[in-house]
Amino acid sequence: MSIASSLTSATLCGASVFPKALACSSEFPINLPSPFESSKICLTSFPASRDLKKNATLNLTRNVGPVRCHAMQAGTRELKKFELSDVIEGKQFDREMLSAIFDVAREMEKIEKSSSQSEILKGYLMATLFYEPSTRTRLSFESAMKRLGGEVLTTENAREFSSAAKGETLEDTIRTVEGYSDIIVMRHFESGAARKAAATANIPVINAGDGPGEHPTQALLDVYTIQSEIGKLDGISVALVGDLANGRTVRSLAYLLAKFKDVKIYFVSPEIVKMKDDIKDYLTSSGVEWEESSDLMEVASKCDVVYQTRIQRERFGERLDLYEAARGKYIVDKDLLGVMQKKAIIMHPLPRLDEITADVDADPRAAYFRQAKNGLFIRMALLKLLLVGW
């Protein structure tokens, strides 16, 4: 377990800053910079019975000699290690862990700029390796790290502008990058690449999407959004719509929804991009009721959540005929809003093309931009937990 001081930095006579205390139970000297080079500062705790405040006061005992610092918040707290070393797939999480992560995410929502909490990752470096395009995932991770006081190492397009373009193996890239950073966030075009990276690295690895495999942090923010918007996770009905064969977000989301009671999942997709059997088998073995349907209007009228996804052109290769056949079959528009429940929500991992019409955006049930914002808080929580613990 690591130890975190509850005492924030203070200023001596408005000039010199002394370091954070490692303990408040005894005196210890601290060397001061000019103009107090010949002095030392000693830390003494007040009796535990005294009311404590989150600051420190400095008393000059005389013009020369030691300066005594009285810490008005005594003691230390232990940070419990996070149960996971890496975040690779949805099946890693249980219900209790999800609840605890969401509690931390809610704390992240309240962090103010320039507060002590906004510096909890100061001194840490995050490396982002994105071999596929990203807007929300990459920027929200980088924003999360910086909002907690950390720094970011990045390459614009790891597939083209890293040594992968020269033929370097993923394992060699990971071994190199871990020497420069404290945590790696990686998106890759191959399913299973994140697991390979985690097996190679001696620092935490977060899967930011591995081809058609999984996207666990997206699923975390999705479930967090459902809980925030609907108010519950047990007893809900969710429609997963669109490209269910290639969409990694729906795969990870299905794994997480299976942790809750009395959940029903509807799969609505063109025949060529149906949900794969491994997810269906997992849901069945977990006791989750699921159903395939071709009628989005009927399903939407029953559901608390309509989770729309785009048909992924990049997964079809040269088969543009198959892509065009699948694209545009299921659209969320004003007509669909007309049959949806008043308290239901529409979600989308984004980016969208034409599968949600723009006139839906103004409806309060359109939750996808609120969903994207929640990604910041979930990723702040994960970075904090993986690097410093609970």
From Swiss-Prot:
Pathway: Pyrimidine metabolism; UMP biosynthesis via de novo pathway; (S)-dihydroorotate from bicarbonate: step 2/3. UMP binds at residues 136-137, 187, 215, 248, 310. It is found in: Plastid, Chloroplast. Keywords: Allosteric enzyme, Chloroplast, Plastid, Pyrimidine biosynthesis, Transferase, Transit peptide. Residues 1-68 form a transit peptide. Its main location: plastid. Pfam families: OTCace, OTCace_N. Transmembrane segments: none annotated. It catalyses: carbamoyl phosphate + L-aspartate = N-carbamoyl-L-aspartate + phosphate + H(+). GO terms for cellular component: chloroplast; chloroplast stroma. GO terms for biological process: 'de novo' pyrimidine nucleobase biosynthetic process; 'de novo' UMP biosynthetic process; amino acid metabolic process; cellular response to phosphate starvation. Feedback inhibited by UMP. L-aspartate binds at residues 166, 248, 310. Its EC number is 2.1.3.2. InterPro entries: Asp/Orn_carbamoyltranf_P-bd, Asp/Orn_carbamoylTrfase, Asp/Orn_carbamoylTrfase_sf, Asp_carbamoyltransf, Asp_carbamoyltransf_Asp/Orn-bd. One of its GO terms (molecular function) is aspartate carbamoyltransferase activity. Homotrimer. Catalyzes the condensation of carbamoyl phosphate and aspartate to form carbamoyl aspartate and inorganic phosphate, the committed step in the de novo pyrimidine nucleotide biosynthesis pathway. Belongs to the aspartate/ornithine carbamoyltransferase superfamily. ATCase family. PANTHER family: ASPARTATE CARBAMOYLTRANSFERASE, ORNITHINE CARBAMOYLTRANSFERASE, MITOCHONDRIAL. This is Aspartate carbamoyltransferase, chloroplastic. It comes from Arabidopsis thaliana (Mouse-ear cress). The lineage of its organism: Eukaryota, Viridiplantae, Streptophyta, Embryophyta, Tracheophyta. The gene is PYRB.
